[in-house]
A protein has these predicted regions:
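Intrinsically disordered, low-complexity regulatory regions
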Residues: 1-90
Length: 90
């Protein structure tokens, strides 16, 4: 059984705020329309760098997690948005 009590609630709330802000700005579950995985990857990388540089203009750590969660959902539900093959080298 999954034990949701193991997830730290305060940090989970920070991620949930990202979803709520998006719903207010773009509409309920708009993120489920999907975007190429590269868009989530690029955004996560930008937010990770901003977090690492201690940029305080938004919750960059939560944005990193939000992007990864959306990428995971896209990977499982929108295989047509998986553009990783376009960026791999042989």
């Amino acid at each position: 059984k999954l034990r949701m009590s193991l997830i730290p609630q305060q940090e989970l709330n920070r991620i949930m705020k990202r979803y709520l802000d998006g719903a207010e700005k773009y509409g309920h579950n708009n993120w489920k329309k999907g975007m190429p995985l590269s868009v989530y990857f690029d955004s996560a990388q930008r937010h990770l760098q901003a977090w690492w540089q201690n940029d305080q203009d938004e919750d960059h750590a939560a944005a990193v997690v939000w992007n990864i969660l959306c990428a995971m959902w896209t990977e499982n539900n929108k295989s047509d948005q998986d553009d990783r093959h376009e960026y791999t080298t042989k």
